[in-house]
Amino acid sequence: MKAEILAIGTELLMGEIVNTNAQFLAEKLVDLGIYVYHQSVVGDNEERIMQAYELAFSRSDLLIVTGGLGPTKDDMTKEVAAKFFKRELVLHPESLEIMKTFFDARNLPLNEGNIKQAYFPIGAKILPNPNGTAPGCMVEEGGKTFILLPGPPREMIPMYENHVVPHLKPYQKNVLVSKVLHIVGIGEGHMVEKIEDIIDGQNNPTVAPYAKAKGLTLRITASGQNQSIAEGLIKPVQEAIQERLGEDVYGEGDITLEEVVAKKLIEKKQTIAIAESCTGGMLSGRLTNYPGISSVFMEAMITYSNEAKIKRLDVSPQTIENYGAVSEETAKEMAIGMARTANADIGLSVTGIAGPGGGTVDKPVGLVYIGLYLNGQMQAKKLIVSGDRQRVRKLTTTYALDFLRRQLMKV
């Protein structure tokens, strides 16, 4: 089955809101073994919506439309669908009664715009919406299926899960299973180079790399008659990849890097304190996202100025004068100073130049030092991080967590 997703709404075209519906639907359709061949967005314009319907009908078996089911005049998803299928719009009494109950309970008037939400192309299957006032519907003709869903995700997602999935299940020939591996500390090009033969040599399962701000992701997807068969196809490929990439693979599934680090700290009963400069609390924020971290997380400081580094962390003024605030030496002193101040086993520090200004030839924007005090030893790592200020700060937190993760593996 060839599937297509169409989002309707001028606000999407204008970039006022992000089309998270398409991402959700594409991912969930793949879980059913239904591949999305096309995605598109059109504004609230009858002619362009009609063109999108015509194109989808010509090339896809399934079209899922989101948006345009509201009470205003520019909500015309159903109206254009009725014209496309040459069907009359008819009132669905049950939907109208539900709508009346909804408005009566809130002491709100039911206007003509709301009433039009209870009209559907004749012969359509109605999809109830207990989370809003816009029911969806399903129209089938000529072996094709059009499914019209509301735009708000809190309405669309339950409607999809409760009504669309049961309809699509019979079309599922094979089970699709995906295993996601998370990789950090290695560039995408280098990673692909290490496993290129594995990627190129696979048909079932397939291996697809994705680059994200918090690291790289490898998705291994297999198709089988049942879940056990699909998982059996994935296992040897996953093992081969993990053997090649080693410690660069930090986890799988929904686990985050901060969760991995937090679990290692708790498992090894190592307390930690963090001193941040350029990241301004982002590093501590990521680590404290994990529930239970309070058993090992002692405290954190944002020592942005030189004075704060000297006063709060006991960094030597001479160190800053000789080497600068952004240096290996300062990062090390920040780490040990933080550990001693908090009486923690581990001190982790970050100092850098996030930009856009402040860089020099010797110390460019993106220069970062990560300091680590662990087991009585001081270490530091130098990085040059490219990108704008926000990207430099985000990636620095990732590199710092990864640096700590790798050292904890040796404890």
Swiss-Prot record:
InterPro entries: CinA (IPR050101), CinA-like_C (IPR036653), CinA_C (IPR008136), CinA_KH (IPR041424), Competence-induced_CinA (IPR008135), MoaB/Mog-like_dom_sf (IPR036425), MoaB/Mog_dom (IPR001453)
Transmembrane regions listed in the UniProt entry: none
CDD domains, A to Z: cinA
UniProt-listed HAMAP family: CinA_B
NCBIfam families on file: cinA_nterm, molyb_syn, PncC_domain, PRK00549.1
Family per similarity comment: Belongs to the CinA family.
Database matches in PANTHER family: NICOTINAMIDE-NUCLEOTIDE AMIDOHYDROLASE PNCC, NMN AMIDOHYDROLASE-LIKE PROTEIN YFAY
Name this polypeptide is given: Putative competence-damage inducible protein
